[in-house]
């Protein structure tokens, strides 16, 4: 059975979607807020998420960015925002598709089927990563060095997650700036130098001679297990 999570603050829309999706034989879970949606995504492990952008405790774009740190589950945005810039921002953050309200349920169901077919051929990132004496649980957003818990800021954690999910790959400064801070920050390379320094101080055994958070001079950075 296909499990679908609806993250939407309007009860009438959630009820309408639930009726249609359960009629197709799917199991439906609901969340009214960004934070509840992330919790449901981590615990229920749905096969697909339908997401509204205008949530009461935050923007759905932030939901997508946080989710993509540890999950590749398909996300279909269902939003009253119809501007091209909103669609581009959601897709760049990691959404798989975008449908503007008002919408036709038949079109949504068709797009849902396409997203599920596409996702069935992909492999989700491992939410648990270990290197040296560090253990990172991306889904729970918990990090330990040995027995000690390590506290990261939201930006530090987002940068770490992008690096871990691309372990072994060289990521350009522009790629990292876009994925962590957004497209308006792609010229601010000093952000990366500062936050990579923070990660090395907190997670490397010898920050002056890093083994895991490697600088690729003139290009960007690479995480090595």
Curated annotation (Swiss-Prot):
GO terms for biological process: regulation of DNA-templated transcription. Gene3D superfamilies: 3.40.50.2300, 6.10.250.690, Winged helix-like DNA-binding domain superfamily/Winged helix DNA-binding domain. Keywords: Cytoplasm, DNA-binding, Phosphoprotein, Transcription, Transcription regulation, Two-component regulatory system. Its main location: cytoplasm. The keyword Transcription applies. CDD domains: REC_OmpR_KdpE-like, trans_reg_C. Disulfide bonds: none annotated. Residues 3-116 form the Response regulatory domain. It holds the Pfam family Trans_reg_C. The modification 4-aspartylphosphate is found at residue 52. NCBIfam families: PRK10529.1. Member of the two-component regulatory system KdpD/KdpE involved in the regulation of the kdp operon. This is KDP operon transcriptional regulatory protein KdpE. It comes from Escherichia coli (strain K12).
């Amino acid at each position: 059975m296909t499990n679908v999570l609806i993250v939407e603050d309007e009860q009438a829309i959630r009820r309408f979607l639930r009726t249609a999706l359960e009629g197709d034989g799917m199991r439906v879970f609901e969340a009214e807020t960004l934070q509840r949606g992330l919790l449901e995504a981590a615990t229920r492990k749905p096969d697909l998420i339908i997401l509204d952008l205008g949530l009461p405790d935050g923007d759905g774009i932030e939901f997508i960015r946080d989710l993509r740190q540890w999950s590749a589950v398909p996300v279909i945005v269902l939003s009253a925002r119809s501007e091209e810039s909103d669609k581009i921002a959601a897709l760049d953050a990691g959404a798989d598709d975008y449908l503007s309200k008002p919408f036709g349920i038949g079109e949504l169901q068709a797009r849902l089927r396409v997203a599920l077919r596409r996702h069935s051929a992909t492999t989700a990132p491992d939410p648990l990563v270990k290197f040296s004496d560090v253990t990172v649980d991306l889904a729970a957003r918990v990090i330990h060095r040995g027995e000690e818990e390590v506290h990261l800021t939201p930006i530090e954690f987002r940068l770490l997650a992008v690096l871990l999910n691309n372990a072994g790959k060289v990521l350009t400064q522009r790629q990292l700036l876009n994925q962590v801070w957004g497209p308006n920050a792609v010229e601010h390379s000093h952000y990366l130098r500062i936050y990579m320094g923070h990660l090395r101080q907190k997670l490397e055994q010898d920050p002056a001679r890093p083994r895991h958070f490697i600088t690729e001079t003139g290009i960007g950075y690479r995480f090595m297990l």
